[in-house]
Design a protein with these regions (language model features):
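Residues that flank catalytic or metal-binding motifs in active/ligand-binding sites
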Residues: 11, 162, 315
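Short, solvent-exposed secondary-structure boundary motifs
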Residues: 84-86, 168, 273-279
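Auxiliary Fe-S-binding modules of radical SAM enzymes
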Residues: 1-14, 37-44, 50, 58, ...
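Short, compact, well-ordered microdomains
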Residues: 127, 131, 137-139, 246-247, ...
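Cysteine-centered metal-binding/redox modules
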Residues: 1, 272-329
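N-terminal [4Fe-4S]-dependent radical SAM core
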Residues: 1-105
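Conserved AdoMet/S-adenosylmethionine-binding subsite of the radical SAM
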Residues: 88-243, 247
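Structured loop/turn residues at beta-strand edges in well-structured enzyme cores
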Residues: 23, 101, 205, 277, ...
């Protein structure tokens, strides 16, 4: 379990240093995935790398990847969910963003709620500190418990980094969300279960980005939104000049011309884009002699580490000193 390329349209990767949730949403896709990969009948997780946070707390701490074993103790396979959807801190995953050198959008804890009221501050702080060590990425946090954001901000424990975005999941217009001036915030209206009538929605402020999508998975056909609901959200965003991102799940309702906008400053470049030819003005370019193969040009972006060997004779698109490139699209 590491940073994975994501099928979620609005992000590039998912990173899950904390998994599990206690909200009990009936439409939760993450719980279905965790139940699929948890130990099944006649199986159990290997206990060695796992610690219980407190006896009887139902919360766990993993210092290394867990294995599933049979009744005789023979290893069967690895699993990131040895206790299913119980809240779990995967300490061994904290450094993973540093191994991903291309600037990317990273959805943090897609398989849980990092800001659930049951999560210790120490877990959240460890995730924040790890994210700060890889500042080339844009980190997208999402919760159904926005009060935790306010609590952390009051205790001065909520970083205000330009590449940190704090999101709230809501399903209707009356639900509370997090929005403070000077902090990047966004809304994920998914699944949208209620109408958002124009003129009735009375939000004190509109976040800097809004994502909207419909319910997917078993039983979702009975809970599809009406087009008018989406039009209302589109109107709200247009009035507030807030970028709107419609997920692909709305294609059958909205049509092919989905609105998929990102906030200004958030990289819309994705890892699939091609390398850009080397720029002579790059301040990080170095020459590396390879014997009979001659001289190759690399980009030294982080300390003494050579970044992007696959881009020999090119400057990687994520190079922080590319003077000639400001837009990777």
């Amino acid at each position: 379990m590491a940073i994975h390329r994501s099928k979620i349209e609005w992000t590039d990767y998912t990173w899950n240093p904390v998994t599990g949730c206690r909200h009990g949403c009936p439409y939760c896709y993450a719980r279905r995935i965790a139940d699929r990969f948890r130990p099944q009948a006649c199986e159990r997780p290997e206990e060695e790398p796992m610690e219980s946070l407190r006896k009887g707390s139902g919360m766990y701490w993993l210092k290394k990847p867990s294995q599933i074993v049979d009744q005789n103790g023979h290893r069967l396979r690895g699993t990131p969910y040895p206790k299913g959807f119980a809240p779990t801190f995967h300490e061994y995953m904290l450094s993973f963003p540093q191994h991903l050198e291309k600037p990317s959008k990273v959805f943090v804890s897609s398989m849980g709620d990092l800001f659930g009221e049951w999560v210790p501050d120490t877990w959240i702080e460890a995730v924040f500190e790890s994210a700060k060590k890889a500042p080339q990425h844009t980190y997208l946090f999402l919760t159904k418990n926005p009060q935790r954001y306010y609590d952390l901000a009051f205790k001065k424990k909520l970083p205000q980094e330009k590449n940190f975005w704090y999101g709230t999941t809501i399903t209707g217009p009356e639900q509370r969300f997090f929005c403070i001036r000077g902090i990047n915030t966004f809304l994920s209206i998914e699944p949208i279960l209620e109408p958002f009538p124009v003129g009735i929605v009375n939000w004190p402020a509109v976040p800097g980005w809004i994502i909207v999508g419909s319910m997917t998975g078993p039983g979702s056909k009975r809970h599809q939104p009406q087009r008018e609901w989406i039009e209302s959200i589109n109107h709200i965003c247009a009035e507030a000049r807030t970028p709107l991102f419609m997920k692909n799940s709305l294609r059958q309702i909205w049509g092919e011309d989905l609105v998929q906008m990102y906030p200004e400053g958030m990289p819309s470049w994705t890892p699939g884009h091609k390398a850009i030819p080397h720029c002579k003005a790059c301040l990080c370019r170095i020459e590396y002699h390879e014997g009979k193969r001659g001289t190759s040009i690399f980009c030294k972006a982080m300390g003494d580490k050579h970044v992007g060997a696959r881009y020999a004779r090119t400057s990687p698109p994520w190079c922080p000193k590319r003077a000639d490139i400001t837009d990777f699209d």
